[in-house]
């Protein structure tokens, strides 16, 4: 009889253990052993950094450096210093937005227990109504009924204001949107940094735009020339003015839009998906309280410890039946018998070839080791013959109980198991070292 050894506890440093980020089922990309979590489109982050750093570098070299001599004392140096510090601050906010957990809800290993029956309650005598999870549940929030949906991927009911991101393949709390420019979902834990990043980028564009015009004005005053001629003397300023003007429309418009969302306590997803007014939005707490909730509330800790150790899932060992060993294909056939489905005999060919000839019909698909087991009893032979004469198509029947929550063997399988046990007791002296495996299908 093959006995599966009990699982052994392993230390955190054993080779059989992995960290959570190594077994993560989402589409996220991790850096520094799970300390930074990014979205699958993290490469776009490099483009965003270049769009910020390159214009500021051009500004410091060709514009701000020449303004140092035009301002007395330390005012000229401060122009360069402010631009550099502002850029570093902006990039830090970008990293805080892109490299942290946005509020991912850990997915369940198994679906929750079904609570209602789905299907016809007046099922036949040999059938049991199937248990199925309801797709939508209703919850109350501030006196308003919300419908929460079941997520098949994460196997959980998404709480209010939570949505599943198809890009990151995660359910995110207070999901706002997935931003390709930062390569990350925007949710409960990084929305504050996202808005600060967009707002600071807008201010940086205004800063560069303004001092480029200051430099052009200085050229006009020193050389007593027109605006167009002064602009031709500093092509870098012309490029930066055009670039920052276009950028201000994008990031500035995004800043104004999110100021509206914060004042009404909405998310981008809710604004496009639903239409709240001031009376029907259950999340609106007033302009002042909405801003306090966004910028001065405590950021909840992450629900995921990406650096925690998890044990590697061991492979399933072969199971034993009546003193012998059973291959995985044979186990699959037995599982299908227990579930009321037709056994897939074709998949058992390799396992049966070691014990007998696979060319015979279903009546002779019995595993006998070295011919030590005697002829089968008439009862078992009649049962096998009866099953083999049935047509190939059978309705699938589930033995899942209505309330028990467990799989039970059908009476036909129990009766057959009892007959096999009696046969083994009668022939135990001559077949102690052999294994008998017989396959049957419930009627």
Swiss-Prot record:
GO molecular function per UniProt: protein-cysteine S-palmitoyltransferase activity
GO CC annotation, single: plasma membrane
Compartments in which it is found: Cell membrane
Residue intervals of the DHHC domain: 149-199
Catalytic activity: L-cysteinyl-[protein] + hexadecanoyl-CoA = S-hexadecanoyl-L-cysteinyl-[protein] + CoA
Residues in coiled coil: none
Short name of one Pfam family: DHHC
Presence of keyword Transmembrane helix: yes
Phosphoserine modification, residue list: 327, 377, 406
The keyword Transmembrane helix belongs to this UniProt entry's keyword annotation: yes
Biased composition (Basic and acidic residues): 382-392
Transmembrane segments: 44-64, 76-96, 193-213, 237-257
Start and end residues of each stretch annotated as Disordered: 382-443
Membrane topology summary: Multi-pass membrane protein
Keywords carried by this UniProt record: Acyltransferase, Cell membrane, Lipoprotein, Membrane, Palmitate, Phosphoprotein, Transferase, Transmembrane, Transmembrane helix
Superkingdom field: Eukaryota
EC code(s) of this entry: 2.3.1.225
Record: active site: 179
Domain notes: The DHHC domain is required for palmitoyltransferase activity.
Homology family: Belongs to the DHHC palmitoyltransferase family.
Summary of the function given for this chain in its UniProt record: Palmitoyl acyltransferase.
Alphabetical list of PANTHER family matching this protein: PROTEIN S-ACYLTRANSFERASE 7-RELATED, ZINC FINGER DHHC DOMAIN CONTAINING PROTEIN
Protein name as annotated: Probable protein S-acyltransferase 7
Record organism: Arabidopsis thaliana (Mouse-ear cress)
